[in-house]
């Protein structure tokens, strides 16, 4: 029997994001960025090289949800930023031993949706942070608008490519 430090249940976007972190892809803040309050700005600067080390309770005390803290860096405006303007970057660190268990493969339940299915959000809101969907479109020769709704037939190959890139 194999033993692993972490078992991930499910290969959907959530499981893939956890897998990326366990594989060693960790965020950092870089360049010019601004948070809505000077107090949170100072907190972000303190943790810019390792945002995963911050105490989420400290954010909550300042009136900010932790998920919004990271979203403000990944998607600071409604439309997608060019990759060279991203202030959320990723560094490869040591991996943790992990195994993903899934019956659906990378993308999870998206593999079982109707072939005509579109998402309810733009492509760049469906991406997993360290592998931008715009980069996937370029690498696979897809001429797509990353601010438009993404089609299932683009999303599933993106999640599969994401898993392979881990």
Protein language model features and the residues they cover:
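Short boundary motifs at domain starts and secondary-structure transition points
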Residues: 1, 88-91
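A conserved beta-strand/loop element that lines the FAD pocket in flavoprotein oxidoreductases
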Residues: 164-166
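Gly/Ala-rich phosphate-binding loop of Rossmann-like dinucleotide-binding domains
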Residues: 19, 23, 90-92
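Short glycine-/acidic-enriched loop or helix-start segments at secondary-structure transitions
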Residues: 18-19, 110
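Short alpha-helical segments and helix-capping/turn motifs at coil-helix boundaries
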Residues: 81-86
